[in-house]
């Protein structure tokens, strides 16, 4: 049975066994655009990807299902070579430990996402990046654009445009890279992983 048929079954919850790891050829392939109107499988796939991220961020569910926490997932990581990504970035608690008014800073399934504009300034996460498809720690600054404008379609086939900066920008760029066969460590300077070029914004 194909990956998409398995994952879109009503009873199936995405877990770590569904996620392919580095070295798998699908992670190095350029994914196909989805066509509109979206078919039912593509809509269900997006919903299940978002549900996986929710489950991975819930301590009880994550422990029960043995999930690694994630804020983004791309269809190619499920061995489905389509331009579909899900992003779920929680808002932090306030300084007094109270929950945020809005649970998520960004919650979206994006179909055919692409970067249509970006800043001249580069940015990187100070602690580096990780990936659900990479089981090892890869140290170094992953150089990305500080700000991006994203164009994508939602599950209703409506075209959307989103301006992102900081952490949200980094997360979405990471997931879009997966649809282009790019891994995060490709963007680390191999000879000098912690090089700070002039103007680089380090995001804590």
Curated annotation (Swiss-Prot):
Entry superkingdom: Bacteria
Keywords recorded for this protein, A-Z: Hydrolase, Iron, Metal-binding, Protein biosynthesis
Cofactor(s) essential for the protein: Fe(2+)
Cited Gene3D superfamilies: Peptide deformylase
Binding site for Fe cation: 131, 174, 178
GO MF annotation: an example: metal ion binding
Xref: SUPFAM superfamilies: Peptide deformylase
Keyword Protein biosynthesis attributed: yes
One Pfam family linked to the record: Pep_deformylase
Catalytic reaction equation(s): N-terminal N-formyl-L-methionyl-[peptide] + H2O = N-terminal L-methionyl-[peptide] + formate
Record text on cofactor binding: Binds 1 Fe(2+) ion.
Coiled coil: none
EC code: 3.5.1.88
Keyword Transport part of the UniProt annotation: no
GO biological process per UniProt: co-translational protein modification; translation
Uppermost EC category: hydrolase
Transmembrane segments: none
Catalytic center residues: 175
Family affiliation: Belongs to the polypeptide deformylase family.
PANTHER family per UniProt: PEPTIDE DEFORMYLASE, PEPTIDE DEFORMYLASE 2
Physiological role: Removes the formyl group from the N-terminal Met of newly synthesized proteins. Requires at least a dipeptide for an efficient rate of reaction. N-terminal L-methionine is a prerequisite for activity but the enzyme has broad specificity at other positions.
Protein name per UniProt: Peptide deformylase
Organism: Streptococcus mutans serotype c (strain ATCC 700610 / UA159)
Phylogenetic placement of the source organism: Bacteria, Bacillati, Bacillota, Bacilli, Lactobacillales
Gene from which this protein is expressed: def
